[in-house]
Structures are given as C-alpha cells and as structure tokens.
Swiss-Prot record:
The gene is infA. The keyword Transmembrane helix does not apply. One of its GO terms (molecular function) is rRNA binding. It is found in: Cytoplasm. One of the essential components for the initiation of protein synthesis. Stabilizes the binding of IF-2 and IF-3 on the 30S subunit to which N-formylmethionyl-tRNA(fMet) subsequently binds. Helps modulate mRNA selection, yielding the 30S pre-initiation complex (PIC). Upon addition of the 50S ribosomal subunit IF-1, IF-2 and IF-3 are released leaving the mature 70S translation initiation complex. This is Translation initiation factor IF-1.
Length: 93
C-alpha cells in the first residue's frame, strides 16, 4: 500500500498497553489501539498517558493505527524538561 493512501488523525493517549501499544482517544471521538512507529523507537521517543499524538491509519482498518508523532508539552506554567546530567564534573586528567 502506498503512503498516499494513509490518513492521519490527532488524539490523546489514554492508556499504555503491553507490547509497546497505546489506547488513543481520537479528536473525532473514536478509541483505537496504536503502536509506535520505527523512527520513534529508533530515536527513543517516550510516550506517556496524556500526551497529544498524531496517528497514521489505513482506510481499510480504522481500529488500529501507527503512532508517528508526539507533540511537545503545551502545559502552561510548567518548567521545561531537562535531561539527565552529562557527567561534566568527572574529567580525565
């Protein structure tokens, strides 16, 4: 199937399921099961319950989808996320 035939929806992750799957509530009101796309796994992008995501679906099976994008946090007033310390205090002499 060509990529031109896939359709995209936006939604909210409501539940994390086993085997790297997620239950997603679409903006249209439907609830589907989605799995993480390979590029997201490769780049170690974590998805948590409550995240806004973009889902790619086949028009032939509207019950399953592929999670292709996690939108950045849009929570007002929250501090920006910072990664773990890089270990700069220990240097080789």
């Amino acid at each position: 199937m060509a990529k031109e035939e896939l359709i995209q929806f936006e939604g909210l992750v409501t539940e994390i399921l086993p085997d790297a799957r997620y239950r997603v509530q679409l903006d249209a009101g439907h609830e589907i099961v989605a799995y993480t796309a390979g590029k997201m796994k490769k780049n170690r992008i974590k998805t948590l319950a409550g995240d806004r995501v973009t889902i790619e679906m086949s028009p032939y099976d509207l019950e399953k989808g592929r999670l292709i994008f996690r939108h950045k946090d849009e929570r007002p007033g929250g501090p920006p996320r910072s990664g773990p310390p890089r270990g700069g205090q220990f240097r080789r002499r």
